[in-house]
Design a protein with these regions (language model features):
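Structural signal for short hydrophobic segments within the conserved structured cores
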Residues: 11-13, 138-140, 243-245
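Ser/Thr-centric signal marking residues that sit
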Residues: 56, 63, 97, 210, ...
C-alpha cells in the first residue's frame, strides 16, 4: 500500500484590487505526492474566485482513493486601491494653466494642443492611480490673466466647479504689466494671497505653485523678481495653511527642456513635469493611508 498523500501549498499571494469590492485570483492547484491511486486536490476558495479586500486563508485538501487526506493552507491578500480625500480639483491660473506652448521656431506661434496642459495630464495621472474613484480636474486657465484682478472669475469658477482642491499658478502677467517692477511683484503677491484665502474660506484645500524659471537669454521676468515673488508665495503658503508646490525648484535644473523659446511658457515636457509635481503633492497630502 502506498504512503499517505502529501501536499505543499503555494507561497502567499498578494493582489492589488481594481475596486474596493475585491479581486478575482487565479492560482495553480497544489501538486500532491504519494497517496493511493488518483489523488484529488480541492482548494477553498477555488482558483478564479473573487477574494474580498483583506487577508483570506485558502485551505487545500488532497484525498487519495483510500480516503486518506493531507492539507495545507496559504494566504491571499487583496490590497484595496488607493483613495483620495478629494475628487474635484480646480486648476486656476493663466496661460500656463491653459497649456500654451510653442511647437515651431517662431517665438510668437502659440498653441495649446488638446490633452497636453498640466491639468489634463494631472487628470490622467489621478485617474490611473485612483481607479475606484471618479476624479475630475477642471482647467480654469485664462490667457493673460493677472492674479490681482482674478477674484470675480475665481468666485464664479468655484461656485460652478465646487472643488475640494484648488491649485493656484499665476503671477507672471501681474509683473509684466505692472506700472513699475515693484508694483508688478506686489500685485502678484496680493492676488495669490487673496485667492488662497478665499479658497480656504470656501473649504478647499489650497496648493500654491511657485513661478517657473525663465529660459536663459530670453527671460521676461528678472531673476530678482522671480526670487522675490516665489519667496512671498512660500510665506503665503505658510500663513494660509496651503501646500507649496515648488515648480521653480523642479524645472530649474533642465530649464531648456522645460521652457519654450519665448522664455516664459512651458514645453509639452515642461507641462508634463508640472503635472507630475502637482500629482505628487496631492498624493502626499490627500491620499488615504
Amino acid at each position: 500500500m502506498a504512503d499517505a498523500p502529501e501536499i505543499t501549498c503555494p507561497d502567499p499571494i498578494t493582489v492589488s484590487a481594481g475596486s474596493g469590492v475585491g479581486a478575482a485570483v487565479s492560482y495553480a492547484l497544489p501538486e500532491s505526492r504519494k497517496g493511493q491511486g488518483a489523488v484529488s486536490v480541492v482548494c477553498t476558495p477555488s482558483p478564479g474566485s473573487t477574494f474580498p479586500v483583506g487577508v483570506t486563508q485558502t485551505q487545500c485538501v488532497a484525498t487519495d482513493t483510500l480516503s486518506r487526506t493531507a492539507s495545507c493552507s496559504f494566504s491571499v491578500t487583496i490590497v484595496a486601491p488607493p483613495r483620495l480625500r478629494a475628487t474635484r480639483i480646480m486648476a486656476f491660473g493663466d496661460s500656463l494653466t491653459v497649456g500654451q506652448t510653442i511647437l515651431s521656431n517662431d517665438p510668437y506661434d502659440f498653441v495649446a494642443p488638446p490633452g497636453t496642459s498640466y491639468p489634463a495630464v494631472l487628470g490622467q495621472l489621478l485617474s490611473a492611480r485612483y481607479t475606484d474613484q471618479t476624479i475630475t480636474v477642471f482647467n480654469r486657465g485664462l490667457i493673460g490673466e493677472q492674479a490681482w484682478r482674478a477674484m470675480p472669475r475665481f468666485i464664479d469658477a468655484f461656485v460652478t466647479d465646487r472643488p475640494d482642491v484648488v491649485v493656484l499658478q499665476e503671477g507672471y502677467n501681474d509683473y509684466r504689466v505692472g506700472e513699475t517692477p515693484a508694483i508688478g511683484v506686489a500685485n502678484a503677491v496680493l492676488g495669490i494671497s487673496e485667492l488662497a484665502r478665499e479658497a480656504r474660506r470656501r473649504g478647499a484645500r489650497v496648493f500654491i505653485c511657485t513661478l517657473a524659471p525663465g529660459r536663459p537669454g530670453r527671460v521676461q521676468i528678472p531673476a530678482w523678481a522671480l526670487e522675490d515673488i516665489n519667496a512671498q508665495y512660500r510665506r503665503i503658503a505658510r500663513d494660509e495653511g496651503a501646500v507649496l508646490v515648488d515648480l521653480y525648484a523642479v524645472l530649474a535644473p533642465d530649464v531648456n527642456a522645460y521652457v519654450s523659446i519665448d522664455g516664459l511658457h512651458l514645453t509639452l515636457l515642461g507641462y508634463r513635469r508640472v503635472a507630475e509635481t502637482v500629482f505628487a503633492a496631492i498624493r502626499a497630502e490627500l491620499e488615504i493611508r
